[in-house]
Design a protein with these regions (language model features):
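Alpha-helix initiation and N-capping motif
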Residues: 5, 22-26, 417
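Terminal amphipathic helices with adjacent charged low-complexity linkers/tails
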Residues: 44-49, 176-177
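N-terminal amphipathic alpha-helix/helix-capping segment at the start of soluble metabolic enzymes
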Residues: 2-14, 47-111, 328-333
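Local cysteine-cluster metal-coordination motifs and their immediate loop/turn environment
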Residues: 13-31, 40-44
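Conserved mixed alpha/beta catalytic, RNA-binding, or beta-rich assembly cores of soluble enzyme
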Residues: 34, 82, 92-412, 418-420, ...
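Glycine-rich beta-alpha loop elements in corrinoid/cobalamin-binding modules
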Residues: 423
Length: 448
């Protein structure tokens, strides 16, 4: 059961030293109880108090790390069932599935296709992060290890779908340094699989024929000292899988049952084998409803664009606007004599506009104003993107650095042109297009 602020306060040193950033120990205790701060941020907390508080104040869902280096990812650590209650913290990761039942040509084709989906959206890299390597019932250790080694060459974090401890041990010998997930523990083999995963130092995936068996198996693994787990909630059909995934998350977060407080794997290949359209639809469902690792047969651009866009929208903090730093961004080799274009600091606006400006090839200085992370029309309506804010920023930040006196403003705020001309004497105010897609033609026409 989570502690409240008063219970935490009783164990604090009560110095009111402010070194944690809070004015009093009571304020610090309240923030710890709300999950806004960690108990370790108090520099004067005794070891005994830390030991008693750390477990009680930890998130009900454990944070699990997989992979290494650039391919390291964090799963779990969630504290709320719904994004609007606070925020989601660990986005789901998508995996493309390989299997020993495939021939070499099919495996090679899949491995060659995975790197093709790799692009940036609003400053975030969108790519297939994981490869799920499944061991079919008729495969031996040599065949499975060869497939794992081939998949490892792609440089993505691996998830090993294998229930045979000896085969799993052999496969881990070639990939354990990359910190993969070993997804294969169940009620009949969990002791042996636990030994293999613990020896290799990797995360262990656990499954069960139903939630009761899954719960008992996880509890048994915890008794063995292993809390580095993920739960495979894939059931016999879509309905059961959805129910399993939601009930596991609700048990952990609402009922505070830490036995189910682990990230989830959802294997869509088992639910809709060969139906790529249905898999994409289900991936969107489990992106919103609690899948931590989502396994699919493929990830093409047609599937990636909506899925990654959905994931990015759901897994942003609703309490913080998506914004970029205000400043001057030279594009296409711009210098002090290059044209000045201005817009707001809303991240989506910035990346769309800057992308079109770069595509034009015209050297220019993109000036980003502090508009509170709002879009052009919203910030204008709120008074955050006004002739006053723009002119003051131009005078203080731009005029000392840029000699060009031509300023392009968004077409949607053309009404600001007159005021800006009055407040920025010596500047030529040019009304740009209303849509970013029109910028390339607009800039080329200006140069003509």
């Amino acid at each position: 059961m989570a502690l409240n602020g008063i219970q935490i306060f009783k164990l604090t040193p009560k110095k009111n030293c402010k070194e944690c950033g809070c004015p009093t120990c009571m304020a610090f205790s309240m923030k710890v109880a709300q999950g806004a701060m960690q108990i370790e941020q108090c520099p004067h907390m005794s070891d005994e108090a830390l030991a008693s508080l750390s477990e009680a104040t930890a998130p009900p869902m454990k944070t699990i790390k997989i992979g290494t280096g650039d391919a390291e990812f964090t799963l779990g650590g969630e504290t709320v069932l719904f994004r609007h209650e606070k925020t989601f913290v660990s986005k789901p990761r998508y995996a493309v599935s390989l299997c020993t039942c495939m021939d070499d040509a099919e495996v090679d084709a899949k491995l060659a296709a995975i790197p093709h989906v790799d692009y940036d959206r609003i400053g975030e890299r969108m790519h297939v992060e994981l490869v799920y390597v499944n061991c079919s019932a008729d495969a031996d250790a040599a065949k499975y290890t060869a497939l794992v080694e081939k998949a490892k060459g792609l440089g993505r974090t691996l998830v090993l779908g294998c229930t045979d401890p000896e085969i799993a041990k052999a496969a881990l010998e070639v990939c354990k340094d990359g910190k993969p997930v070993l997804n294969g523990a169940n009620a009949s083999n969990y002791e042996a699989m636990n030994a293999v995963a613990t020896e290799a130092g990797v995360v262990l995936g656990v499954s069960g024929k139903d939630l009761n068996e899954l719960y008992d198996t996880v509890a048994a693994l915890e008794k063995l000292g292993n809390k580095n787990l993920v739960l495979d909630t894939t059931g016999a059909d879509i309905k059961e899988t959805f129910a399993n995934t939601v009930m596991v998350r609700r048990a952990a977060l609402k009922d505070q049952d830490r036995t189910f407080g682990y990230p989830s794997i959802v294997n869509l290949v088992k639910l809709a084998k060969g139906d790529h359209h249905l898999q994409a639809a289900l991936a969107s469902v489990f992106t919103m409803k609690y899948g931590s690792i989502i396994v699919m047969e493929q990830m093409t651009y047609a599937e990636a664009l909506p899925l990654f866009g959905l994931r990015q929208n759901v897994y942003t903090d609703p309490q913080k606007p998506m914004k970029v730093e205000p400043g001057i961004y030279p594009l296409n080799g711009a210098d002090e004599n290059s044209l000045v274009v201005t817009t707001v600091d809303f991240a989506l606006t910035y990346f769309v506009v800057s992308g079109e400006l770069e595509r034009s090839g015209v050297p220019l200085n993109l000036v980003i104003n502090d508009a509170g992370g709002l879009s052009v029309l919203t910030s204008w309506a709120a008074g955050k993107f006004s002739s006053t804010s723009i002119s003051e920023y131009i005078k203080t930040e731009v005029e000392p650095k840029v000699k060009c006196r031509k300023l392009v403003i968004p077409g949607k705020v053309a009404v600001l042109k007159g005021d800006l001309e009055a407040k920025l004497p010596g500047w030529e105010i040019i009304v740009g297009p209303r849509e970013a897609v029109q910028l390339v033609k607009f800039l080329k026409d200006m140069q003509a």
